[in-house]
Structures are given as structure tokens and as C-alpha cells.
Amino acid sequence: MIIALDTYLVLNSVIAGYQFLKDSYQFYDSGALLLTAVSLLLSYHVCAFLFNQYKQVWTYTGLGELIVLLKGITLSAAVTGVIQYAVYHTMFFRLLTACWVLQLLSIGGTRILSRVLNESIRKKRCASSRALIIGAGSGGTLMVRQLLSKDEPDIIPVAFIDDDQTKHKLEIMGLPVIGGKESIMPAVQKLKINYIIIAIPSLRTHELQVLYKECVRTGVSIKIMPHFDEMLLGTRTAGQIRDVKAEDLLGRKPVTLDTSEISNRIKGKTVLVTGAGGSIGSEICRQISAFQPKEIILLGHGENSIHSIYTELNGRFGKHIVFHTEIADVQDRDKMFTLMKKYEPHVVYHAAAHKHVPLMEHNPEEAVKNNIIGTKNVAEAADMSGTETFVLISSDKAVNPANVMGATKRFAEMIIMNLGKVSRTKFVAVRFGNVLGSRGSVIPIFKKQIEKGGPVTVTHPAMTRYFMTIPEASRLVIQAGALAKGRQIFVLDMGEPVKIVDLAKNLIHLSGYTTEQVPIEFTGIRPGEKMYEELLNKNEVHAEQIFPKIHIGKAVDGDWPVLMRFIEDFHELPEADLRARLFAAINTSEEMTAASVH
């Protein structure tokens, strides 16, 4: 493109120079004009390549680039003069001078115009991407540094807001600190702000809620920087800002990992993750990849989801980690044993499961096959292959279960606790509440309802649930694997349960609406649902806190013969009897545990 443009401008300078001089200047013949044009063109391009003119970025043209251009044009004119003298024993100085001036003006002008247009576009872009940064501490300065390090930053930080009065009226990173949060609204109006970026990674949830409400009043777009844990693990950088989500306003303090202990358990090891294409399984894979395992086996029965997570992880970590994909069903016992024998994983995270309460109420046999039989297959195969640590992803619905899904999870816990008695593998279970943002969870459902204009459906105004984010749940699972000693149930101190109706209201407000514009409708409790969930029952309560925010519950082994008898018989049971026998099996086990305690 540039070469073609320069060719046109060089030839045009010869023609224009001739037209300017023809009435007062006589050439020997038309061949002299042709010789001048060809000589100037060829010598100019040779000089341009010698001086690397075509490797320069002309949108950043400066004095240095113009001097190089001047050298090339002057040298090509000199070469042309020598050729003219060799052929005609004279040089056409007036024509050469005219061509030199016209080339310099036209070619140099296009370079300068390119820069002027680029600067104009950048100024327009900057005018629509001016950001006010909340937080002038280490997080805010780190984020500003990364934003400004880009050649063409998408967002231009223009000022800081910070409640620390000692920083007011100072300049940090060249940006003024103009006041505390009471200055947010005036700053947005005065500085023509388009974005507010909350850059305090350690901000407590209540403080974030208050700050967010203040920012919402301005009417501009609100962003937030990643949490320090995400930056520490390398999953996000300070400059990768994002929209504020319902999870941020949930009231949960993220779990801080013991990265050294996790690294000791995972670095250089072979890790297998079942359900690797699911919400939790895929996030576990992302986070353990930061600890440099030797290889990760991505196991799942959905080819599209497995291909998606493989493509993502191999692109990010493929230079240092070998990723294997295995399309398989955990209900296929022979396949599980074959894969365990093939890879001999050091650590297994068993995330494959059916989790939707209403669906499992209507399909109890499928819940048993996947959550119970599947867990037994994977756990026994891991035991056979000499796996060091086996982590079962369980649920708070396994506590005093009132539905089929919870009962099958409770059953699965009992299976691994019994295996842990006789195996060298450390079997542990991790229990947590509902996961925000996972497929089929309330957040995606509420979002779709809001997009349609409502109503947002909530079962009961008093219904509460414990909630975790997907990254937080995955961190707990990984940390549990690092802490595992065997036959343990890890439970996160999840703080206070959250009212579902409050979560719905927050999401409506985050979407820019009021509850008058998008109403909330109460539909009644569904089959198998409880008004509230528990994390431990009375037989499991244990005083020990093994890690900040992580408690240990006492292992419940259950009555192994009763459990195995159910597994042997369930295929022949009608649906009503299956549900009754399932609950009878786990309740008998609970009674035995309670009796042994007393």
C-alpha cells in the first residue's frame, strides 16, 4: 500500500514538475523526461529500502522519520542527476529541484497527515474513555501503570479518589488525588468521566456495597479490578478490569490460599479432573494450572465442553503442561479403571455429578447412577492406581438431605469414607453451598428473566441459601486437596446465608432497573427444596479449624453392608421404592454413627 502510494507520488512529482517548467524550459526530447521519471522512481525505492522507510510506523512520524525521508529523496535526486549527465552530458537542475521539492512535500505530507489523523482518532477515543480511579493505594497504582503501559490504552485514567486525607491534593503516577468518596459526583461532572474503576482489591463487601451505591448515582459505567488472589495466581492482571457482578456484592470474603502447600502437592504431578467441562471442574483446571502440574487429564462426557476447556488451557499453559482429553462417563466402570491405570494420577478431583434438585426428584435412578455408582467407580479406580489424594466435590444438600440429589451426595461421602479405612489414598470430601454463575444456577436464570423484562421468579420471600463464587469454590477444593490427611469432610465458613430475594434485587439494580420496572414474583417451594440449608449435622460438628475459613466435620462411615445392598438392588427397584430405600440406607448409617458417638 505504502509502496504503491509512493510510486504514484514520485511519478506525479515528475509530471507536475514538467508541467510547471515546460513553458520556460526545453528538454532534448521526450526520452529525457522518461529517463528522469524511471531513474527517480527506481533510485527512490532503492534508497527507501536501504533506509528501512517501509518498516517504519508512519502513524508515529516524527522529526527522525522525516530526516530519513529527506536523505532518501535527496540521494535519489543525486543518482538521477548522475544518470542524466552520463546520457546527455548535462543535468536538468531545474527539473530535479522541482521534483525534489514536490516529492518532499507530497510524500512527507502523507506521513504527517497519517500521524495527525491517528492522533485525532486517539483523542476522540480518549475523550470517550476517561476514567476516575477509586483507590490510590498499591492496587490502584498497579492498575494505572498497566493501563498506561499499553501503546493505545482503551481507558485513560485521569484522577484518583481516596479516603486517605494525607493523599488529597497530591499527584500519584501523574494523576491528582482530588478527594474522598464524597467527591465522586463532582469529579465525574467536572472531569467528564465515562468510567469509574474501583481499584481496592482488599475492600470489604459492606464497604463495596456502600461505595457501589455512591457510584451508581453518577450514571456512568462502573468497573472493578481483579482480586489479589487472582493476580497472585496469574489468572488475571491488574489491568484486566471487568464489570461489577452480583458476586462482588454478595457479602463473602474470598478464601486466601496457602500457595506453597498447594504447590508442594501439585507441582510436577499428574492431576485428573472428572467433570472437567463443567462450571466447577473447568475452574479447578484453570487454577491448578497456575501451580505447574506435569499433566492434567480433562475427563468428561460432553465433547464440546471438554474441547472448549482444552483449547483455553492449552493456549495459556500448553508450553509447560501436557493436557489430555478423555471423553468418558463415570458410570462406565471398566473405562474408569482403564484410564486410572493408563495415567496413574497423583491427585483426583471428582467434580462429575448431577446437581439440579428438581430434575433429580423426577429422575432418581439417574441421580443414583451418576452420583453414587459413578463416585464408587472413580474412587475404587483411584485406589487401585495408587492415587495419593482423592477429593470429592460434595454439597451442603448432603446434610440432613430432604431431596434425592442431597441423599446421593451423602451416600457418595459415605462411600469414600469407607474406602479411606482400607486404602492408602487420602479420601476427602469438600462441602459448599450454591455456586453463583454456574450453569443452571440462579444468576443466569435471573439474568434471562431480567432481559425479558421480568418477572424474576423467587420461590419464597424467606428462602435463604449459602453462596460461593465459582473461583472461590474451586479454591476451597484445591486447598482441601493440599490439606488432606484422609477421611475428612472440609466445610467452608460461609458466613451468613443470603436471602434469594435480596440476590434478585441486587441483580435487577446491577442491570440498571428498579423492582418496579422488573417485578419479583413468588412461585412457591418446589419438590425437594428446603427453606434453608445446613453445612454440618449434629453428628459431624467438630471444633477444629484446620485452615482460616475451613472447618473439618467428623467423617460418617455409614453401614457398609446396607450401602452395598442398595447398590446391588437399585436397578430392580420401582421409583417409589428406590427413593425410600435410598433414604433408609443413609439414615440407617446416620443412626449407627450417632450410636457409636454416644
Curated annotation (Swiss-Prot):
Top-level lineage group: Bacteria
Keywords, comma-separated and alphabetical: Cell membrane, Exopolysaccharide synthesis, Membrane, Transmembrane, Transmembrane helix
CDD domains: UDP_invert_4-6DH_SDR_e
Pfam annotation, one family: CoA_binding_3
Location relative to the cell: Cell membrane
Parts of the chain that traverse the membrane: 1-21, 31-51, 63-83, 87-107
Alphabetical list of SUPFAM superfamilies matching this protein: NAD(P)-binding Rossmann-fold domains, S-adenosyl-L-methionine-dependent methyltransferases
One GO cellular component term noted in the UniProt record for this chain: plasma membrane
Membrane topology: Multi-pass membrane protein
Gene3D superfamilies listed in its UniProt record: NAD(P)-binding Rossmann-like Domain
InterPro entries noted in UniProt: NAD(P)-bd_dom_sf, Polysac_CapD-like, Polysaccharide_Synthase-Rel, SAM-dependent_MTases_sf
Biological process annotations from GO: polysaccharide biosynthetic process; positive regulation of single-species biofilm formation
Major subcellular location class: membrane
Summary of the function given for this chain in its UniProt record: Involved in biofilm formation.
Family assignment from sequence similarity: Belongs to the polysaccharide synthase family.
Designated name of the protein: Probable polysaccharide biosynthesis protein EpsC
Species: Bacillus subtilis (strain 168)
